[in-house]
Amino acid sequence: MDVSKYRKDFPILNTEDGPTYLDSACMTLRPQVVIDAINEYYTKYPACGGRSVHKLSWQVTEGFELARDSLRRLMGAESTSEIVFTKNATEGM
C-alpha cells in the first residue's frame, strides 16, 4: 500500500519535516478537504443544526443528514438512524 498518496491530503504531513503523529487521543489530523469544509461552515453557516427554525439551521441540518447518508452507504448500514455522531470516543461508548 502506497501511503504517500494519502499523506498528501494532510497539510501538516507535507511540511519539510512532516511528523509521525501519534497523539490521536488529543487531536486527530484532518485532511485539507475537512479543513475546507470546517472553514466553509464557520464563514457561511454559523448555526446549530437540528434545533432552530431559521434558514441557516435548516442548511446545517441538511448537510448533516447528507453526511449521515453518505456514511450509511459507505458502512453498509440499512438506515441513517444507525449512524450516530458524538463529540468523542468516550462519549460514544
Task: Mark where each language-model region is.
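Pyridoxal 5′-phosphate
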Residues: 1-93
